[in-house]
Amino acid sequence: MRQILFRLIGILEVAGGFYGMATVLPRLLGSGPLHAAVIQLIAFALYTFTLVAGVLLLENSERGIRFSSISQLLQLPLIATPIFSYAFYCGACVNVALVLHLPPRPELTWHFGNQGLLLAVGGPSASHLGLNLLALLSWLILKLR
C-alpha cells in the first residue's frame, strides 16, 4: 500500500511539475519588467524542484522522500491578504480556507491535473487563510512511512 501511495504522489508531482514548467517557460522568456521575471523564475524553480522530487520518489530513493516532503510543505499554506498572497499547488489540490469577511465563511476549492502559483505583494480585499488538504495528507503519508 505504501508503494502505491508513494507512486501516486510521485506521478502527481512529475505531471504537475512538468505542466507548471511548460506553462511558466514562455512567460519567463517573454517577461518584461524585472519583478515579473523574478516571480516567473521563482515559479519555474518551484516546478522544477517538484518535478525532480517526483522523479526521485518514483525511483524510491531516500532523497526523493525528503524532497517530496519539502515540496508538499511548500504546497500546504494558502494565504491571501491585501498585503501578501501565497499559494502553490502542483498536480492536484483540495483547499479548505476561511474567508475573513463579515461574516466569515468557509470555502472549499479543488483542482486536479493542474498547477498554480500565487505569489504577490497585494491580494484580495477579503483575506483568505487555508490549507491544501491533499498536500497535508501527502506529507503525512511520506512522514509516516
Question: How would you describe each model-predicted region?
Answer:
Residues 1-145:
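Topology signature of small-to-medium multi-pass alpha-helical membrane proteins
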